[in-house]
C-alpha cells in the first residue's frame, strides 16, 4: 500500500527532477493580449492592487497555491512560503492535509501561523475523501490544525485514476459537498489540480454554496505525468503519459466558469508563469491568481529565493496594470482583451 507521506516525498522529487508540464497543451494565455495604453493617466507606483477577502487584507491578488505537507522536508518548504506570503501580503494554500488527518504527528509540517500570523490561509483536503469516511469532523480538524480562513477541497479524478492505489469511488459526492459547505463555519473553495473546471460543473458548485472556485486549468504541471513517473508497471506508465494533454486550458476554463456563474469568487491557477498572465486572468474575471510549481525549487533553498521570485511576478503584475491605465483591480478587470489569432476583442460577461 502506498503511504501518504511517501507519496508526498515522491511528488516533490518528481516535480523538481522531471519534465512534468502538460505536453501538447498550453494555458491559452499566450493567445490573449491586454489592450496597451500608450499614455497612462496613473503613476506607476500609485497602482494599488490590494483587496480585502474574507476579512483579510491582501496587498496583491496573488495566491501561493497548494504544494506540499506531510514530511519534514515539506515543513521547511511551507515555512519559507509562509514567510514570503506574510512579507508580501499575499495568500497561501497548504498541500493536502490527509497525511496529518491519518497521523496527527505530522500536523507540524503544515503549521505556519507562527511565521505568518496575518495571511489569508487555506486548509486543504481531497473532495473524494468524503466517500472514504471523511466529513465535517475531518474538515474542521484540517481548518483548526493550521488556523485557516477557508478550506480547499481539491478535485483530482484523473490523478486518482492513474495513481497506484488511487481513489476510484466518485459517485454521490455532490450531496456530500453541499452538506459540508452548509455545516462548515469557514468558506469552502473547490479547485482542480491542473485539468480545469467546466462551466456546467462551476454552475453546480455555485448551487452547492461554495465560496470560491479555483479553475486550476491545464497548461502547467500535469499530475498524470507526475504519476507516470511513479508507476513501475509499464502499461500503467504508458496510460498515465497518454493523458499529458488532457484538460481544459486555464484561460478557457476561467472564461467558462466566469460566464456560467454569478456573484461567486473565481481564482485562476494552472500554468501561471508571469504577472502578465496574472493580469490577463484578472481581466478575464479572476479575483486571485495562483502559482506553485515554478517556485518549488527556490523553496528548497531559502525564503529569500522565494521572495525574489514572487516579488518579480508582482512587479510584472503592477507594470501590466500601469500599461493598461489601470490604477486598481476594478479597473484592471475592465481592461479589454484581444485574441491574437483572430484579431477579435473578447466579449466579457
Curated annotation (Swiss-Prot):
Residues noted as binding Mg(2+) in the record, renumbered to the chain: 160
Protein's UniProt keywords contain Kinase: no
Domain of life: Bacteria
Cofactor needs: FMN; NADPH; Mg(2+)
SUPFAM superfamilies recorded: FMN-linked oxidoreductases (SSF51395)
Major location category of this protein: cytoplasm
Subcellular location: Cytoplasm
Enzyme class: isomerase
Any one GO cellular component localisation term in the record: cytoplasm
Transmembrane stretches, start-end: none
GO biological process: isoprenoid biosynthetic process
The protein's name in its UniProt record: Isopentenyl-diphosphate delta-isomerase
Gene symbol of the encoding locus: fni
Amino acid at each position: 500500500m502506498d503511504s501518504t507521506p511517501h507519496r508526498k516525498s515522491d511528488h516533490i522529487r518528481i516535480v523538481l527532477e522531471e519534465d512534468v508540464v502538460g505536453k501538447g497543451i498550453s494555458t491559452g494565455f499566450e493567445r490573449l493580449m491586454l489592450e496597451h495604453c500608450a499614455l497612462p493617466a496613473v503613476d506607476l507606483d500609485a497602482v494599488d492592487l490590494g483587496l480585502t477577502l474574507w476579512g483579510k487584507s491582501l496587498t496583491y491578488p496573488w495566491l501561493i497555491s497548494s504544494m506540499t505537507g506531510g514530511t519534514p522536508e515539506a515543513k521547511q518548504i511551507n515555512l519559507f512560503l509562509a514567510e514570503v506570503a506574510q512579507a508580501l501580503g499575499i495568500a497561501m494554500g497548504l498541500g493536502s492535509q490527509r497525511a496529518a488527518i491519518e497521523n496527527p504527528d505530522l500536523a507540524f509540517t503544515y503549521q505556519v501561523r507562527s511565521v505568518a500570523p496575518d495571511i489569508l490561509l487555506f486548509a486543504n483536503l481531497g473532495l473524494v475523501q468524503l466517500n472514504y469516511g471523511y466529513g465535517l469532523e475531518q474538515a474542521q480538524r484540517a481548518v483548526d490544525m493550521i488556523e485557516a480562513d477557508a478550506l480547499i477541497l481539491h478535485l483530482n479524478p484523473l490523478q486518482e485514476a492513474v495513481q497506484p492505489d488511487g481513489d476510484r469511488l466518485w459517485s454521490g459526492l455532490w450531496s456530500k459537498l453541499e452538506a459540508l459547505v452548509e455545516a462548515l463555519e469557514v468558506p469552502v473553495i473547490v479547485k482542480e489540480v491542473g485539468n480545469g473546471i467546466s462551466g456546467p460543473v462551476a454552475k453546480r458548485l455555485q448551487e452547492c454554496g461554495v465560496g470560491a472556485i479555483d479553475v486550476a486549468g491545464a497548461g502547467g504541471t500535469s499530475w498524470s505525468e507526475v504519476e507516470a513517473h511513479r508507476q513501475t508497471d509499464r502499461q500503467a506508465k504508458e496510460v498515465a503519459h497518454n493523458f499529458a494533454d488532457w484538460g481544459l486550458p486555464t484561460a478557457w476554463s476561467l472564461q467558462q466558469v466566469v460566464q456560467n456563474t454569478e456573484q461567486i469568487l473565481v481564482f485562476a491557477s494552472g500554468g501561471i508563469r508571469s504577472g502578465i498572465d496574472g493580469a490577463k486572468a484578472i481581466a478575464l474575471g479572476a479575483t486571485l491568481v495562483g502559482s506553485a510549481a515554478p517556485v518549488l525549487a527556490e523553496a528548497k533553498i531559502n525564503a529569500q529565493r522565494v521572495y525574489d521570485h514572487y516579488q518579480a511576478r508582482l512587479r510584472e503584475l503592477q507594470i501590466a496594470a500601469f500599461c493598461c491605465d489601470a490604477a486598481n483591480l476594478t479597473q484592471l478587470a475592465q481592461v479589454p482583451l484581444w485574441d491574437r489569432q483572430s484579431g477579435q476583442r473578447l466579449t466579457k460577461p
